[in-house]
Amino acid sequence: MNGTLADQLQSHLANYGQPMVNSQRNEDPSMYMNGSAASVSHTNGSSSMGNDQKFPSYKRMAQRRKVPEGELCAVCSDLATGYHYGVASCNGCKTFFRRTIVSEQTFICQYNGNCDVNKNIRCACRHCRFNKCLLVGMDAKALQIPAIQNDRDRIGPTKKIKMSSGSDDEQATTPHRLQDQEIIDQLTQVEGLCQELRRCIIPEVTGVTHALTSPCLLFETTDLKVDVSLTNTIFKELFPASMNDIRMWNIREMRICIEWAKTFDVYQRLNLFDQFALVRNFAFAFNLLNRVFYSPDHGPDKIVFQNGAFIMRQPQQQVQLSGCRPIYTRQMDEIMIPFRKLQLSVAEFATFKAALFFNPDALDLSPQAKQEVFEERNKYLGGLFTCITQKIGIPTGVQKYGSLLMMTASIQNILAQNEENMQVMELFKNWEVDPFVKELCMKRA
């Protein structure tokens, strides 16, 4: 696995600076200012209008003005990176707004048109996110439409790619970046759907095969009942976790893992045997990664589940089992704390998980599936590299990318230790492992 990751990094560094010629399009951005619906329509206009008219001077000043330290994005409340299109906003919302305008997309809300838009679930409903962009004052007239840029390039030399910049508006668009961004957007949207499913009552299944062959629940969350014990957890007092809390979250996360896996087209094309092999290899990693990433930050010595239950660095007596080696300290030191130091975004986290999931070395994966899984992993590694570097630039981005990939060894070691603990539980019967978890996580003899 490590060789594959290193090769992919070298490949993306080599291919990074090849610009794609932008198609010439004559558009009037003022057509995009109707805030009553999250839709974009196309009309022909004149590309000869001066840049000062298309991009008023006060907007240019706003774009250059630095945001105060700690300023939040007006759209999703993530940390703002600057004034984009007239509004203090993060790179994610800036890119989303620009892409929506330029690609003429139309979105439909599946609910009542009043979805919550915040940094954790901002990709769940693009209709409401685009409306929020307009509501807070993002100005489509501030976009420099590609046709204007092409006219400018014909007059003067083509601008060089700014390799040190993290802004995709300042870098030339390349084919692999466009493809990577589509991958990132899709994964981030699915991540939001997983968060919705975590708050729902998940139907029971008879086993892993039943779960794999059932329709994907991520697209049916509106039909599921909300689990009231998991709502508004941010306002609840924390309480020490019991073994029942841990058991409940293990089962829930592994059920969500299967629903998450079923959103990948390549995964759906695999036969059932290979599907089983991939999820068995990754299910507990999915559980572990989500546990620490979504744990509210109550310091480096505490993992907090989303229902308010917590585990300390020195686990409380009720979650200690005879003969089992504690793994929570390693989860904190080797995964949770590094994630926080890297300031991992939801998009980066979602793409990292996808790259880990498609493991061509997964036990019992058929030779026929290995090549397809290998290519799929490379696709998500490329998406991860783009996701990181477009935000913070190549030099810093390479370090962050490498730091993430180096964590895979720790993740594998923790998984091996968990497997050992499950074998001890099974041998000494000091805790009954849930049948679904056992089928999904314990390697066959």
Curated annotation (Swiss-Prot):
Record SUPFAM superfamilies: Glucocorticoid receptor-like (DNA-binding domain), Nuclear receptor ligand-binding domain
Limits of the NR LBD domain: 179-444
Keywords, comma-separated and alphabetical: DNA-binding, Metal-binding, Nucleus, Receptor, Transcription, Transcription regulation, Zinc, Zinc-finger
Zinc fingers, NR C4-type class: 73-93, 109-133
Start-end of DNA-binding region: 70-145
Cellular component terms per the entry's GO annotation: nucleus
CDD domains in the record: NR_DBD_HNF4A (cd06960), NR_LBD (cd06157)
Function recorded in the entry: Orphan nuclear receptor which acts in concert with the insulin/IGF-1-like signaling (IIS) pathway during osmotic stress, perhaps in response to a ligand modified by the sulfotransferase ssu-1.
Region annotation Disordered: where it falls in the sequence: 19-55
UniProt-listed InterPro entries: HNF4-like_DBD (IPR049636), NHR-like_dom_sf (IPR035500), Nucl_hrmn_rcpt_lig-bd (IPR000536), Nuclear_hormone_rcpt_NR2 (IPR050274), Nuclear_hrmn_rcpt (IPR001723), Znf_hrmn_rcpt (IPR001628), Znf_NHR/GATA (IPR013088)
Location in or out of the cell: Nucleus
Name this protein carries in UniProt: Nuclear hormone receptor family member nhr-1
UniProt biased composition (Polar residues): 36-51
UniProt similarity note: Belongs to the nuclear hormone receptor family.
Segments crossing the lipid bilayer: none
Primary localization class, coarse: nucleus
Organism expressing this protein natively: Caenorhabditis elegans
Signal peptide per UniProt: none
Name of one Pfam family that matches: Hormone_recep
Alphabetical GO biological process terms: cell differentiation; regulation of response to osmotic stress; regulation of transcription by RNA polymerase II
Highest taxon listed in the record's lineage: Eukaryota
Coiled-coil zones: none
Keyword Zinc-finger recorded: yes
Any one Gene Ontology molecular-function term assigned to this protein's record: zinc ion binding
Outcome of swapping residue 295 to L: In n6228; many mutants fail to undergo developmental arrest in response to osmotic stress
